[in-house]
Amino acid sequence: MPKLEMMLLVLLILPLCYIDAVGPLPPWNMEDEIIEHWQKLHCYEISDLTPWILCSPEPLCGGKGCCAQEVCDCSGPACTCPPCL
């Protein structure tokens, strides 16, 4: 097979991995994956009842539900973090 025909065949097949049965796949968001990986390394869950709130032993602020352990308020059914200053 000549090189031109081979290249056209590859260019025809290549986009198929980006198309799902229901349409184009959503774009990959690296920022969310980086934040999730960082939270797994630096934060931990306060209780099984509130897996959506994370507190950190380090003084952090504004990291998608991650705040310093000493300012996490877990008195009651849910944990909350104060707003960042």
Curated annotation (Swiss-Prot):
Q: Where in the cell is it found?
A: Secreted
- Propeptide regions on this chain: 22-40
Taxonomic superkingdom: Eukaryota
Keyword Ribonucleoprotein among record annotations: no
Provide the alphabetized UniProt keywords: Disulfide bond, Neurotoxin, Secreted, Signal, Toxin
User: What is a single molecular function from GO for this protein?
Assistant: toxin activity
- Where would one find the signal peptide in this protein? 1-21
Its Gene Ontology cellular component terms are:
extracellular region
Tissue expression per record = Expressed by the venom duct.
Q: What does the entry's PTM section describe?
A: Contains 5 disulfide bonds.
Predominant location: secreted
Described purpose of this protein according to its UniProt entry: Probable neurotoxin.
The entry sums up its family as follows:
Belongs to the conotoxin D superfamily.
Domain-related comment: The cysteine framework is XXVIII (C-C-C-CC-C-C-C-C-C).
Please identify the protein, giving its name as recorded. Answer: Conotoxin Lt28.3
Q: What is the lineage of its organism?
A: Eukaryota, Metazoa, Spiralia, Lophotrochozoa, Mollusca
